[in-house]
Structures are given as structure tokens and as C-alpha cells.
Amino acid sequence: VGDLDDPRVPPACRDWLRECETMTAHNTELEFAIAFNYGGRAELLRAMTLAAAGETDVSQLSENDFRKYLYCPEMPDIDLLVRTSSEQRLSNYFPWHTAYSEFVYTDTLWPDFLGAHFYSAVAEYQTRKRRKGGKAVTES
């Protein structure tokens, strides 16, 4: 996920990433995304530019219509985002896909993030009452 056509990306790196995409294009068991040269604002700006140049009347554009112009339109919304290194910000990371995400913050640095940390984050996520923008349901 990102702008591989950016001239600042070394050609050998670009070729290797595209080869990896081709080699894994028909895999169906796991979805795995690498954010490389990715910026959320750049993705949204690109999507808006493509939508405006497209056949759809932008005043009638739905979320599903707009999604078609994102880098990975088939990528589902992110349910859980684990932010390592104690940073509590998105840092321009997938603004469209994280609109209703749950966040878990950890002081653990990414290179030190192990399976136990992952399971702990998932366990915390499982305690959440997800509303996806809706009001909290009060129990009577």
C-alpha cells in the first residue's frame, strides 16, 4: 500500500515489491499489507482527484464509490490498530480505514513486539464494546 510510482522510490525496490505482489496475488488464506511510501493524506487526495476525473457525479458519490479510488479498495476497515513505542497518534496512517478502529497502545517498540504482546492486545480488544460511531447502548 503506497505510492510505488514516486520517483524517489529506487527502481530495484519498486521492482522487488511488484514481484512480491505478483507472486502472492492468488494467495487466499491471509491478507497481509505492507505500508511502503504511504501517506494517508496523499491517498485521500489521489482518490479525490481520480473520483473527480471519473464518470461518477461527485455530488452523488457514496462511500462505496469513493472506496474504489483508494490504493487498496478491497482492503476491509481495520478493526484493531496496535500502536507501538507509546506513541498515541495515527501519524497519517490509513485515515479512511481507521475511522471506526479500536486502538491499543503499548510502550513496546516494534522490533521487540512478540506474540505475547499481540495476544495481550487482542485480549484487550475483545473487552471493547464496539459501536462504530453509534451511541453506547445502556443496559436497563
Give residue spans per PLM region.
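Flexible, compositionally biased loop and terminal segments
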Residues: V1-S140
